[in-house]
Amino acid sequence: EYQIISTLPSITSAASYLTDYSFIDTAEKGIPYLQNGVTLEFFKDAACTDKIATWTETDGKFNASYTTNDAGYVMSITMTESGLSEINTSKAVYTDASMVNSGYSDCTLRITYSAQLDKSANYGDKGNTNDVVLTWKRTNSSYYDTLVDDCHVYVFGLDLTKKFSDGKGDLSKVEFCLQNDADDYYVVAKYDESAKAYYVTGSTDDKAKATRFT
C-alpha cells in the first residue's frame, strides 16, 4: 500500500477556488499499479486522525487513469467538477458564516493506492524511483503551480528451502503463509512461472485469503 499526502492550499473566496488539483505519479518499471483501487481521504489535521470525507473511484469526485512510458508506469489523478466543488465550498470544516476560510481549505489529503512487484524490479540498495507531481490552479490565476516530490522503493527477496530432517516426506504437501506481526497482516503474492518465484501483490488481514506458498 502506498500513500501520497498533501496539504490543500487556503481557500478564502470564490476568487481563490481551485479549478485544478491533480497528481501525476510515476513508478519505475517493476512496480505496476493495481488499478481501480485508489482512495482519497480528507482530514482536518496533518496527522490524519480527524477525518472529514472519504472518496473512492466510484463516487465521481475524481478520475484515475493509467499509462506507461519509457520511465515506467504512470497514474494520473484529477478532480472532477463535483470533487472540486466539494473541496471549494463544503461546510463540513468551516461551519460558521463569519469564518474566512471555506471548503477543505488547509486540510490534509491522503491518497492511498496499491502496486505490485514483478521480475523487472531493482533489488537491493539501488531501489526503484517513485515520483509524484502535484498541479493546482485557482480561479483568479492564469498560471499553474506545481510541487514535485520523490521517494525510492526498496525491494528484497526471501530464499526459502524446505527440508525434512530425515530426508523423507512429501514436500509438495508442506505449505506456509507469511505474516507481518508488527502490522498484523498476511502477504498475498502471485507466482511467476518464468522466474520461478512469487511476487508480492498485496496484503490481507484474513489468514484464509493469504497466499499459500508451496
Report residues per predicted region.
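Solvent-exposed loop/turn and edge beta-strand elements of beta-rich ligand-binding domains
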Residues: E1-T214
